[in-house]
Amino acid sequence: TATGGSVATAHPGAQSIPTELRKNILACIMHTMEQTEDFCDSDFGIERLAEKAGTNSRYTSVVINNVFGKNFRSLLNEYRIKEAMRRLMDDDTYGKLTIKAISESVGYKSQANFITVFTRITGIKPSMYQKLSREEKEKKINA
């Protein structure tokens, strides 16, 4: 309101975005995050995701918040960590890489930030995850 009260239209919900457009934005988000590794680019941001969806970052943000119940940064971190977990388990392809190199390969500019986010999402540090994955693989080979 003009008196400083909250205005529901200041940050429109998904209802203010036409249904077809909402569906298209969601389809593009899902395609980009599930079928490409674009999110592993350290400069990947909501603007680039919105551009791929043919819309603006505000609409993209609203769809992410409404569908996933989280903000873009949280969604991006989850996909990056999921990919890091895959890479930490893939000794054949990534086994010679350091944790720092893997963190950079999934888009983190700071190894410390990567370790913090990885630990928050998985409950263990990346080095421990890699060690446990290798031990599990050894058990299967020796079984």
Write out the residue ranges for each language-model feature.
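Binding-interface segments
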Residues: F114
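Membrane-proximal linker segments that couple transmembrane helices to downstream signaling/catalytic modules
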Residues: T1-S105, V117-R120, S127-M128, L132-A143
